[in-house]
């Protein structure tokens, strides 16, 4: 069960994951131990999965983003497909989807040659019968945080 204080803590941490318990405590007018305990519980519940740095992929040299639609031969291969996707460093996201495909991957690579090499590898994964790629030309919104205002009506994430 999340209360308003938990939601405020999560909002602060989503804006800046390096915010200290002391800084959060000051902004919410609570004690440092109270904030630390709440963060610990949010982590134990799995609401906070991890803390990480958000990189600028273009400045890091990954200039090309693509969405790769996967058509799989049979659902027997899904587990191995997901395992391969999880092991592939170029795969940023992997989702099971409805429609003509079975999965969609969001991938980031250096250039078109790297994408071609990656697609060759993916097409050789067990069960993959076809891929279709769509290149991202421009990105106007990429969000890593959840809009916690929607939680004002639903406080239970269990």
Place the predicted regions along the sequence by residue.
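A compositional/biophysical signature of low hydrophobicity enriched in polar/charged and small residues
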Residues: 1-158
